[in-house]
């Protein structure tokens, strides 16, 4: 995928245009391969959080990426520092699929997708306006980084049923938390490999393991093997920080024919 042509024209990408906003959502921002907007549920909850989605409508034949694309690609990024009364925003990702399109292997979505996001208010009882700088890759045979600012006033239509339904459905589609019978166990590896044992229901041939390179980690595509009736994924560690972090962990998603789960694994 490194050989894909990259087309970047600043904040005005290709034939990009802004379509009118409605309800507690931003205007659609359109580019050659699709369009993107922010949708919110409107009202903040008691903890000062507003739920929303980054809604990505892809044209047929186009794709976008998971939190760690793989060989190449641009993961979705959301910067809310220009917002009013928004402290931060956390993106979540539905289970990706693994693809090999001849240019490289990548993890993501070749269909329209809504990425859930939680906005945290700086002051829970005060009004907020979201000004989100969005950066993501939408690719076909060329890869077009989409770069724009999406603005939402969540209180403009806080009881909009369509917006609330989209947000609710998108959060419901996220992988469930990993558990003992559907998750991974980290096995002994070495400085250059991450090895995990996968526990899951369903067909072993349909299972896949995705781990996100964060905190200066970079991973290759996993290989599969079997040991004592268990499916083993061995993931090359292509790069790593000089010192292993002691806080947090690496996001992973495990998929199977029966669904998907996600969790954090210790830094290798």
Regions found by a protein language model. Give the residues of each.
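N-terminal secretory signal peptides that target proteins for export/translocation
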Residues: 1-2
